[in-house]
Amino acid sequence: MVGVLVNGYGSIGKRVADAVAKQDDMKVIGVTKTKPDFEARMAVTKGYKLFAAIPEKKHLFEEANIPIEGTIEDIIEDADIVVDGAPKKIGKANVENVYKKHNVKAIIQGGEKAKDAEDSFNSLWSYNRCYGKDYIRLVSCNTTGLCRTLYAIDSITDILKARVVLVRRAADPNDIKTGPINAIIPDPVTVPSHHGPDVVSVIPKLDGKIMTSAIIVPTTLMHMHSLMVETTGVTKDAVLDAIEKTPRIIKVKASEGIDSTAKIIEYSRDLGRLRYDLNEIAIWEESINVVDNEIYLMQAIHQESDVIPENIDCIRAMLEMEEDNIKSIEKTNRALGLLK
């Protein structure tokens, strides 16, 4: 059983820790925090060994009466791999200043740039490329969702051009500092947005074939994508079948009352999901259409959780624990209780 250190027990880190803890071939050897907040206290309550991410701040945890095992320097060399959950730009610095120094493999998250790691990971597309590598970037929630859907489409036809409009949530539910509250913001105002090139970092054959634009709207629950994908030839039934066969994608029906991101979140709550996480992306079945070989569909992405199962598969790939990506996906899905 391999040992995983989660460096940064925040929005992504705490979910990764819980996901690792559910696997039978890996374990959490520790988690880190930069400050003694409620998440640090919760980590200890849940049984995780807590370490100070910044050694000079260890005393703050002691002063706050939060049990602390030491600093990251005391645990990192016991780790087979580190999952970095730090804010963007910090992950890159951690690779250069911490992980390479201690000769430990690491996964950084999608806030970093593709050039900051050896490759970009998605369980369906780049598992084999990342097999045995030392420093891998796990792409963002939006890119992860797009890669899954484009995988389904690519399995049945050739993609000539993909156009995507991303409607992004303004902030996570616990974020009181980010907006907007009463505006719609082109972000970026230029086209393409960074999402297209990010998809290409995972799927090189789509270079020159994907165009994305993005806006931010005042909601916290989920992102939404509208896809228009030109193909060499396809039917609606074939698209429906491909989506059904692709892991970590579910179809939802507006006709059954799931007609908004709010209803998708309510559905996730009713599934009994911790933190109402929906690791699967949700495609509205009624939105799927094919006109003149061009596929149209709309999908929703739970930005806090869709990348979590990918982190687990990435651990297996980098540590050469399972050669077959589909077997890893199925193993992860079973452990996490995913729908498919």
UniProtKB/Swiss-Prot annotation:
Gene3D superfamilies: Dihydrodipicolinate Reductase, domain 2, NAD(P)-binding Rossmann-like Domain. One of its GO terms (biological process) is glycolytic process. D-glyceraldehyde 3-phosphate binds at S140, C141, N142, H195, G196. One of its GO terms (cellular component) is cytoplasm. It catalyses: D-glyceraldehyde 3-phosphate + phosphate + NADP(+) = (2R)-3-phospho-glyceroyl phosphate + NADPH + H(+); D-glyceraldehyde 3-phosphate + phosphate + NAD(+) = (2R)-3-phospho-glyceroyl phosphate + NADH + H(+). Pathway: Carbohydrate degradation; glycolysis; pyruvate from D-glyceraldehyde 3-phosphate: step 1/5. NAD(+) binds at S11, I12, G111, R169, Q303. It is found in: Cytoplasm. It holds the Pfam family Gp_dh_C. Its EC number is 1.2.1.59. Homotetramer. This is Glyceraldehyde-3-phosphate dehydrogenase. It comes from Methanococcus vannielii (strain ATCC 35089 / DSM 1224 / JCM 13029 / OCM 148 / SB). The lineage of its organism: Archaea, Methanobacteriati, Methanobacteriota, Methanomada group, Methanococci.
